[in-house]
């Protein structure tokens, strides 16, 4: 008997427009009727994972940000693996010479150190979240903008950092540098 089903969101549970199809909603409700539960496993932040679930009238525990945080049915943080300030600073140092946009996923949502013009240009070139569900305004509203020095003054818990650039060559160089940081999954 199936007791638990773990489901990814992007490319699995969600349609390309970012919504859960009625067919998938029925399937998940059918699981519950059979006595099974489901949980979400995603690279998304908790806030970004919760939105399509709420819209579909579904509730589930969420393993988010590639396992960095686990939330229960009621949205309470059950477990977390934080990046240390040292790791975050090393990541910033590794990327210093590149024109990078960062998505710092934290306990208080997503932060970026990008200037708004750079952020918009990246979005318009479909480098930043190239999914149909997102408009520029919708993406912009999901981020808080901060100067690099402010990030540590805010007392944020860092869970995941996405490094965004349109060049695979640049990303390859950065990946090589980041892989040298101890206790960091790249």
Label the predicted regions:
Residues 1-2, 64:
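Short, small/polar residue-rich loop motifs at catalytic or cofactor-binding pockets
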Residues 94, 98, 105-186:
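Conserved acidic, metal-coordinating active-site core of Asp-based
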Residues 22-129:
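Active-site phosphate-binding/coordination module
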């Amino acid at each position: 008997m199936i007791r638990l089903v773990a489901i990814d969101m992007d490319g699995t549970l969600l349609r390309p427009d970012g919504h859960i199809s009625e067919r998938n909603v029925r399937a998940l409700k059918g699981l519950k009727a059979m006595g099974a539960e489901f949980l979400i496993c995603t690279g998304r932040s908790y806030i970004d994972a919760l939105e399509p679930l709420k819209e579909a009238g579904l509730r589930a525990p969420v393993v988010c940000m590639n396992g960095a945080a686990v939330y229960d049915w009621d949205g309470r943080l059950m477990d977390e693996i934080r990046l240390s300030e040292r790791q975050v600073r090393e990541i910033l140092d590794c990327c210093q010479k590149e024109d990078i946009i960062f998505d710092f996923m934290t306990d208080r949502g997503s932060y970026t150190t990008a200037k708004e013009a750079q952020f918009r240009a990246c979005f318009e070139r479909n480098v930043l979240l190239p999914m149909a569900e997102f408009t520029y305004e919708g993406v912009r509203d999901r981020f808080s903008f901060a100067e690099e020095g402010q990030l540590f003054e805010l007392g944020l818990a860092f869970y995941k950092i996405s490094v965004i650039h349109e060049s695979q060559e640049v990303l390859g160089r950065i990946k090589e540098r980041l892989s040298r940081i101890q206790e960091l999954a790249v």
